[in-house]
């Protein structure tokens, strides 16, 4: 049945989405940021590489993929949007393969397929699968990279890692995360092979590993050589990117004014709410352990709650775009709750703490290298973004969700899938029925994620 799922999932996903795609495609020439992406994509599709919109802030990966349409004479708005739908079809296949490998047989192929479907219809991700935005194809490249990295096929992994960075600069963080995990896993595996201590005692958090490395120059040399052999391809991405940062002075290309880096720690709190809210099956499984963790550590929990309140008070950033653009749900969340009631951002602190504990409990069973590298990567990719933008949460959420444990509670997975589908119905209904006009746009504006 494994081979059947590899065909059924992508084909079924595209066929299921096609009527909705055609309806979305007929509503507007451009949807918000598509006014930058589509003209640029059409120019590259026609091989007009001297055309570049200075307002674009990402590398040209999204537009280079448009070259695939040129031989097919599909350099149209519909053709560009179809690239995203095709990418979403590839994503569901990759999600299935990666999830099945992580589960290692637990739950079977049908369970992995169910999980892949659930992640593919994650409402913000599913919505942008119908538009020519960076998000879907950026995730495609990250998943291709992660898939090959899992299999220790480091050369193709590096190729797709570079492609992911061409899609979105912040994807360099996930390349660095996987590189760091490779280094840490190599240290553990090399030390375990010596047989000097039981394999189960060789842990990143334990002293046995580090004592072995310090006491054996030969072992240390073997580790270094093995790490260099595995990571040289990733270094060929990371080092040039460091050079780019040094020369450019910023991770952003083009118009840097709207994307200046500034410390914004509450992004972690927003992500925790996002992950706990959409990852219903993990939240159901980890809610009791998280509540017990808080109960057993009341003093630490109180201190953590106070720290959250201090961070919210001192470091809440409000980007002008968040207040100015009423075409996004975040505008309404902020204007009607966070911005309207001064106390609301503080009242959310207990929910932030509980959501963080749910994520922490979800991490506990994962490999030690992931437990170390993922939180660091999450901090780097989110906490220097001033703008609250749910699309920034998609890749870290999917990587976290892929690594969660099999719930063994069938209703939890079905509840999560059902909630995603119902929310998709609601958000597309709003998109199709709620129209309003801006003075400088001739076409009606609509509300999206």
UniProtKB/Swiss-Prot annotation:
Pathway: Protein modification; protein glycosylation. Dol-P-Glc:Glc(2)Man(9)GlcNAc(2)-PP-Dol alpha-1,2-glucosyltransferase that operates in the biosynthetic pathway of dolichol-linked oligosaccharides, the glycan precursors employed in protein asparagine (N)-glycosylation. The assembly of dolichol-linked oligosaccharides begins on the cytosolic side of the endoplasmic reticulum membrane and finishes in its lumen. The sequential addition of sugars to dolichol pyrophosphate produces dolichol-linked oligosaccharides containing fourteen sugars, including two GlcNAcs, nine mannoses and three glucoses. It catalyses: an alpha-D-Glc-(1->3)-alpha-D-Glc-(1->3)-alpha-D-Man-(1->2)-alpha-D-Man-(1->2)-alpha-D-Man-(1->3)-[alpha-D-Man-(1->2)-alpha-D-Man-(1->3)-[alpha-D-Man-(1->2)-alpha-D-Man-(1->6)]-alpha-D-Man-(1->6)]-beta-D-Man-(1->4)-beta-D-GlcNAc-(1->4)-alpha-D-GlcNAc-diphospho-di-trans,poly-cis-dolichol + a di-trans,poly-cis-dolichyl beta-D-glucosyl phosphate = a alpha-D-Glc-(1->2)-alpha-D-Glc-(1->3)-alpha-D-Glc-(1->3)-alpha-D-Man-(1->2)-alpha-D-Man-(1->2)-alpha-D-Man-(1->3)-[alpha-D-Man-(1->2)-alpha-D-Man-(1->3)-[alpha-D-Man-(1->2)-alpha-D-Man-(1->6)]-alpha-D-Man-(1->6)]-beta-D-Man-(1->4)-beta-D-GlcNAc-(1->4)-alpha-D-GlcNAc-diphospho-di-trans,poly-cis-dolichol + a di-trans,poly-cis-dolichyl phosphate + H(+). GO terms for biological process: dolichol-linked oligosaccharide biosynthetic process; protein N-linked glycosylation. Its EC number is 2.4.1.256. The chain crosses the membrane at residues 2-22, 59-79, 82-98, 233-253, 261-281, 299-319, 341-361, 370-390, 412-432. Belongs to the ALG10 glucosyltransferase family. GO terms for molecular function: dolichyl pyrophosphate Glc2Man9GlcNAc2 alpha-1,2-glucosyltransferase activity. Glycans are attached at residue 25. Keywords: Endoplasmic reticulum, Glycoprotein, Glycosyltransferase, Membrane, Transferase, Transmembrane, Transmembrane helix. The gene is Alg10. It is found in: Endoplasmic reticulum membrane. InterPro entries: Alg10. It is a multi-pass membrane protein. This is Dol-P-Glc:Glc(2)Man(9)GlcNAc(2)-PP-Dol alpha-1,2-glucosyltransferase. GO terms for cellular component: endoplasmic reticulum; endoplasmic reticulum membrane. It holds the Pfam family DIE2_ALG10. Its main location: endoplasmic reticulum. The keyword Lyase does not apply. PANTHER family: ALPHA-1,2-GLUCOSYLTRANSFERASE ALG10, DOL-P-GLC:GLC(2)MAN(9)GLCNAC(2)-PP-DOL ALPHA-1,2-GLUCOSYLTRANSFERASE-RELATED.
